[in-house]
Regions:
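Polytopic transmembrane helical bundles with strong interfacial aromatic enrichment
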Residues: 1-156
Length: 156
């Protein structure tokens, strides 16, 4: 058991970027999920379309880029903390698995939400595409919560 671990100063910036991108990713996923959920629950067509558009844009402009930055930063800090040739602890695998799967789900949710926005502009309503995008964004939040657990508890 490690009681105190002091990192070299050269690790601080990549770790700060990794943690900041993770926090922004979770925040963007939650904001998008709330907007998409409210779009489904709103009875006014104009309000539902605006919420749907906001949720899709939040996914596109914030969540997906932060997921990419998170993965790049994770590799950067892993290369410093665990150089090639050393074995990675189990929590690193949990982190990669959850980060990559949440990125995939967020990209699919972004595509579906954007298609739902396009359908609503054509007057076809939001429909099943929006429900699927909402479900995938909620699933990605659950996966990101697992990642937060793995990164804070660091199970072996």
């Amino acid at each position: 058991m490690i009681v105190l671990a002091i990192r070299p100063d050269s690790w601080n910036f990549p770790l700060l970027l990794h943690v900041a991108s993770a926090m922004l990713l979770v925040a963007a996923a939650v904001v998008a999920a709330v907007a998409l959920t409210q779009a489904l629950r709103t009875s006014e067509p104009g309000g539902a379309a605006a919420l749907q558009r906001f949720g899709a844009r939040t996914l596109l402009w914030v969540a997906v880029p932060m997921a990419v930055v998170l993965n790049v930063d994770a590799e950067w800090i892993r290369s410093k903390e665990f150089p090639s040739g050393s074995s990675d602890p189990a929590w690193i695998g949990w982190g990669y698995g959850t980060a990559e799967s949440s990125l995939i789900f967020l990209v699919i949710a972004t595509i579906l939400a954007s298609l739902a926005v396009r359908r609503s502009r054509a007057g076809l309503g939001i429909g099943k595409l929006s429900k699927a995008a909402t479900g995938l964004s909620l699933l990605s939040i659950a996966i990101l919560l697992i990642a937060i657990w793995a990164m804070t508890t660091k199970p072996s």
